Amino acid sequence: MNTQTTPSPQFYLTAPAACPYLPHEMERKVFTHLVGPRAAEMNDILTQGGFRRSQNIAYRPACESCRACVSVRILAQEFEPTKSMKRVLAANSDVIATEFTAQPSSEQYSLFRRYLDFRHQQGGMSDMTVLDYAIMVEDTHVNTRIVEYRRREEGSGLEQRPTGELLAAALTDTMSDGLSMVYSYFNPDLERRSLGTFMILDHVRRAKALGLPHVYLGYWVQGSRKMDYKTRFQPQEHLTPRGWERFDPSSMPESPHD
């Protein structure tokens, strides 16, 4: 009697490289490939274990001298927006969010390029070409969608495919226990709209509507100002050596936003 078994995933370790978040630190990552019939199942398990997806790779930090990167997920069903978040929702009441299959467009890349050039000129993604962007969007073996956020045009009906200005977009995985925001970007000239916050709020709304408990935000790095925004979305859980634990925001310095 022959018994066929699914091969176990193979994990690899990257060479040390400069940390993009904390000066004077070196980063290493452990990673595996998300391919085959169990890719979605593995993505669920690994994301719940602190991994992130990039194309067909799942990775997590494996740094020798630092444990600053902490996986964060919002408890979507308990979430209520703060006063400042309600103002963000009001400021974007003219925005239509539409979900599509993970297919890239030249319009998306143009906005993505503007975002990188303004926000991440020195980052590891700064030299991404249109082909690189297409691979980032399409190279997935899990349930990945792209959500476009467009300005509503005067006289456009809700039943029509929105054609207004593309303001932002989010590449998102739908998992068994939540939504994972893989990558998002927006028009950097529209700072007053707080589009990054708006997209997270919209994903919480989507998770609630789907009955999913979590929205995964990736890693929070205490001491990195560019990551501070993630702790504003309460309640949330952080992945610790003891498992997922509810985060106590009173342990953080007071936020100037509320």
From Swiss-Prot:
It is found in: Cytoplasm. It comes from the Bacteria. Its main location: cytoplasm. Disulfide bonds: none annotated. GO terms for molecular function: arginyl-tRNA--protein transferase activity; leucyl-tRNA--protein transferase activity. It is an enzyme of class 2 (transferase). The keyword Acyltransferase applies. GO terms for cellular component: cytoplasm. It catalyses: N-terminal L-glutamyl-[protein] + L-leucyl-tRNA(Leu) = N-terminal L-leucyl-L-glutamyl-[protein] + tRNA(Leu) + H(+); N-terminal L-aspartyl-[protein] + L-leucyl-tRNA(Leu) = N-terminal L-leucyl-L-aspartyl-[protein] + tRNA(Leu) + H(+). Its EC number is 2.3.2.29. Pfam families: ATE_C (PF04377), ATE_N (PF04376). Keywords: Acyltransferase, Cytoplasm, Transferase. GO terms for biological process: ubiquitin-dependent protein catabolic process via the N-end rule pathway. Functions in the N-end rule pathway of protein degradation where it conjugates Leu from its aminoacyl-tRNA to the N-termini of proteins containing an N-terminal aspartate or glutamate. Belongs to the R-transferase family. Bpt subfamily. NCBIfam families: PRK01305.1-3, PRK01305.1-4, PRK01305.2-3. This is Aspartate/glutamate leucyltransferase. The lineage of its organism: Bacteria, Pseudomonadati, Pseudomonadota, Alphaproteobacteria, Hyphomicrobiales. The gene is bpt.
